[in-house]
From Swiss-Prot:
This is Protease HtpX homolog. Zn(2+) binds at H143, H147, E226. It is found in: Cell membrane. Binds 1 zinc ion per subunit. The active site is at E144. One of its GO terms (biological process) is proteolysis. One of its GO terms (cellular component) is plasma membrane. The lineage of its organism: Bacteria, Bacillati, Bacillota, Bacilli, Lactobacillales.
């Protein structure tokens, strides 16, 4: 059951990424049709923008991400218990030892970052280290080490970049149309061709809806990688109860004291900001109750 869950989560992520690239291609083709009368050029430009943006975000400095989240790097001497758990989990996962950081915050949380296992880092709040016992900490750190081993940070970064690219292209396309960028097409093609009218309307509709759809896909990918990291943590620790108990404590945690931006929020094991009341479709994390239920059903 454990390996089936891991396999299913990986497959769902692949499907979502394929849909994401298809959406980016669609929005590019739509903008190209409306503004340049050229589907292909718009499609190529959209994909190029997406790839460049994703590449630049992937190689964002690990130290910069840690600094943005008020994390301080610690040595084995400063935090031996935490350091040794990270070391043990990295050894089991067969990845290089990540850098270790602590965030001075009473909330219970942790996250990992880095584009690859070779330049990764793990951070935990002081609240988490004070409240959780070793069994629970192993579950949490196993979760974060799994994110590193599974290249989740890279996948999530690509998803954020693609969502941003879709939004930027839609915004530029909409502004150019608003200020008369599409007027030439309307004058030149002033016939009653039903197909052209339908194509025009569909292109306009895609420009309007694409940012929302892109955001939903990006959030769905983030939730799937959380499920995968939970299951992968159990694979590393061979102790589902440790992960379950950790999640039960995380469920009671207060929001973090310092502000957390959207990109960083998706990295944490638990939503670091105030819980929102709207649909889970708009959440970076699946409900903890569902995560616990999945682990119990393994």
């Amino acid at each position: 059951m454990l390996y089936q869950q891991i396999s299913q989560n990986k497959q769902r992520t692949v499907v979502l990424l394929v849909v994401f690239f298809a959406l980016l291609a669609l929005i590019g083709a739509s903008a190209g049709y409306l503004l340049l009368d050229n589907y292909a050029m718009g499609l190529v430009l959209a994909l190029v923008i997406g790839v460049i943006y994703a590449t630049s975000m992937i190689f964002q400095s690990t130290s910069l991400v840690m600094s943005m989240n008020n994390a301080r790097e610690v040595t084995e001497k400063e935090a031996p218990g935490f350091f040794h758990i990270v070391e043990d989990m990295a050894m089991v996962a067969q990845i290089p030892m990540p850098r270790v950081f602590i965030i001075e915050d009473p909330s219970l949380n942790a996250f990992a970052t880095g584009s690859s296992p070779q330049n990764a880092a793990v951070a935990a709040t002081t609240g988490l280290l004070e409240v959780m016992n070793r069994e629970e900490l192993e579950g949490v750190i196993g979760h974060e080490i799994s994110h590193i081993r599974n290249y989740d940070i890279r996948i999530s970064t690509i998803a954020v970049a693609l969502a941003s690219a879709v939004t930027v292209i839609s915004s530029i396309g909409g502004r150019m149309l608003w200020y008369g960028g599409g007027s030439r097409r309307q004058r030149d093609d002033g016939d009653d061709d039903v197909l052209r009218i339908i194509t025009l309307l569909l292109s306009l509709l895609s420009l309007l809806l694409a940012p929302l759809v892109a955001s939903l896909i990006q959030l769905a990918i983030s939730r799937q990688r959380e499920y995968l990291a939970d299951a992968s943590s159990v694979e590393l620790t061979r102790n589902p109860q440790g992960m379950i108990k950790a999640l039960e404590k995380l469920q009671l945690s207060q929001p973090m004291k310092h502000p957390v931006d959207d990109a960083s929020a998706a990295l944490y094991i638990n939503e670091p900001r105030k819980k929102r009341s709207f649909s889970s479709l708009f959440s970076t994390h699946p409900p903890i109750e569902e995560r616990i239920e999945r682990l119990k059903n393994m």
